Amino acid sequence: MLSLFDPGTGRAEPLVPGHRGELRILSRGGPPNLAGLCDLLLPDLIRRTTEWHRLRVASAWAETGAGTETGAGVKNGSGAAFRQAASALNLRPPDTDDLGSAADVCTGGDGGPPADGRWTRSGPVTFPADLGGTGPDPLAGLHDRGLDPLALRLVLLGRRYRDPFTVTWPALAAAEAELASWRGLVADWANLPSRPLSAAHRGRIAAAFDDDLDTPAALTVLRDLAADAAVPPGARFETFADADRLFGLDLVRDVGRDG
């Protein structure tokens, strides 16, 4: 089960689904820009980790400002570019506009904890001035340089979500190269005899996510697995494909592609 930092106790506590065994996530909107977009990674990771344990999830994005917030932008035509950017980062859209009852966990926002449920938020992220562009597309700078938006997701997964963080162009370029390397390996492994996934590596990855979303530790396991010649290629393929349900990096994208 996922344990998430609780500001009330100062330690990670199990995140227990409430209503009928369903975890309800409310994401308070930020500005419809790059920072607001990246804030949505936290609820996405909470959702993925909860679903990993075969639990149901319902999510909603809240409006916390007069039409200038993420939730508002997503709900009207002016939010089309924002929705496309969220999709490019593999951030799942909300299930509903109204959860119908109190949320079990609320993320983001500047107004402090909600009346009900756990409250948590990401640490501030600083970006290069030319990364977000000046138009409605928060990922314009990445597109201008021909970079995969998921390179940004990988960079953000490399830090603990509560820590302040600075994104740099060199880090994005390195993430782009690592993604290409992993996808190439996965495509090669897919052509070799299948083997059962590595339960040990799978367990370590899941344990890292359960431990207050320790994504840096989970990435370390993935990197170790990629280089572990003792694990058959078919097992590495199955483990990478399975773990990508948590990482959301499209690691099997190049399987079956020529060249």
Regions found by a protein language model. Name each.
Residues 1-35, 42, 52-259:
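Structural preference for alpha-helix termini/caps and helix-kink/transition segments
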